[in-house]
């Protein structure tokens, strides 16, 4: 109803499981058919796993194959767990080696892994850019989350994005309300992020990466499905008012 034609599926363990590798194949086909009937194209999948933990790599490899099944172009992951406790940590060089080992599978399935600005260790674009540059592959780029860099990294996204524009291939466009450390992520245009400045920076750099809307509300949640629908509609209106096609 809001006018979107593209969707980011989520296979994030313990948080949002739109789809998951252990779902019955028949159920995955039903979801695929549902997307087609509603003319929604799953161009990406959020498949967060701790890429520092060897025991979680097989889970992520399954998510890669699941993303390919749905015809996605991008798979999103934080370096550490997004919403579970980390069972392993590693320095940036170890992370680069671990992620580099995934490149053959990414190439096999024609996917780009976009690493999300998430968590205290990797909460800014500047930090992630160092890892992505070390990996040095077109198959591994940054998913820049505009609100996470405030919440986790304590930086201004307008300035931080300038440090990693060349490495950014995907953006979670998410607004930020309240204090920097408050879990408050409203509809676009309802918070205090200077999105026009971000759009100007992307345009000046010739960066036409896809924008994926993320709305996480407050710890109390949206309150109702109608409130979710309204937030999505408000975000769509905000983007179209700034010249974007949905």
Question: What do these predicted ranges mean?
Answer:
Residues 14-32, 36-42, 97:
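Active-site anion-binding loops
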Residues 15-24, 48-61, 81-91, 182-187, ...:
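Surface-exposed, active-site-proximal loop segments in enzymatic domains
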Residues 1, 6, 29, 34-37, ...:
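Active-site acidic/histidine proton-transfer and metal-coordination neighborhood
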Residues 5-16:
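A short beta-strand-loop structural module common to alpha/beta enzyme folds
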Residues 11-13, 48-51, 79-83, 119-121, ...:
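Active-site-proximal loop/turn and secondary-structure-junction residues that shape catalytic pockets
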Residues 8, 44, 76, 114, ...:
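Conserved beta-strand positions in the central sheet of alpha/beta enzyme cores
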Residues 1-6, 33-38, 68-71, 122-144, ...:
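Histidine-acidic metal/acid-base catalytic patches
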